[in-house]
Regions:
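Charged, well-structured binding/catalytic surfaces in domain cores that contact anionic ligands
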Residues: 149-151, 163, 179
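Active-site recognition of the HExxH zinc-binding catalytic motif
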Residues: 156-169, 189
Length: 205
């Protein structure tokens, strides 16, 4: 099993050095392209000529490349070495809890990153400024507006998304039916609570 951890802070810093009209291409290449198979399964295109595409989706919750400014460095700097190590340890601990029970994982490569959330986004606000997407095996996004509250819950969020990621290696994804979402979210947050305590449960329960 191999974890491919894409540390986004260096990419965000690079984006700040580029003209605005060059930023989207670099953002897509360095942060989204490793997840292209995930988006294909979700039927989300990289072709920006299609009205709903990967950048449209990113815009719902995230700080977009064109909107980045030097003022965002304070948030970017919070994606530091300790932050990435915390994510790595939470991933390994979560996955090991399944392996130790004799569960043989079908997926051997896992791509993980964290993206800057947009604090003005209604979707981000209703999620208390942090969220995740781990429903496609092998791929996990974490999204957050970095602050003490959200960073303290990033390990729990990783456990939640790992539960989704492993469960969907054995359960067919039903394109997000309400019934399946209720079951999936309940199981994932129960697992996160078991791993990191009730004090770190998310707003999804």
């Amino acid at each position: 099993m191999k974890l491919h951890l894409i540390e986004s802070d260096s990419v965000y810093r690079e984006l700040l050095t580029l003209p605005v009209d060059q930023r989207d291409a670099v953002f897509k290449e360095k942060l989204l392209l490793p997840f292209k198979e995930k988006f294909a399964i979700q039927r989300i295109s990289f072709d920006e000529r299609i009205p709903f595409n990967v950048m449209t989706l990113m815009g719902y919750m995230h700080k977009m490349p064109k909107d980045l400014s030097e003022e965002d460095l304070q948030m970017i700097n919070q994606f530091d070495k300790e932050f990435w190590e915390n994510i790595k340890q939470a991933f390994n601990r979560s996955v090991e809890s399944f392996i130790s029970k004799g569960i043989s994982l079908k997926q051997q490569d896992y791509y993980v990153t964290a993206l800057l959330g947009n604090e003005a986004s209604p979707m981000m606000r209703i999620n208390e400024n942090y969220s995740g997407d781990g429903g496609i095996p092998g791929y996990i996004f974490l999204s957050l507006v970095p602050n003490e509250y959200t960073i303290n819950r990033i390990a729990s969020a990783m456990a939640h998304e790992c539960n989704h990621n492993i469960r969907y290696q054995f359960v067919d994804w039903e394109m997000g039916s309400l019934k399946e979402m209720i079951v999936a979210e309940g199981l994932a947050e129960n697992f996160a609570e078991k791993m990191f305590g009730q004090e770190n449960i998310g707003p999804w329960v």
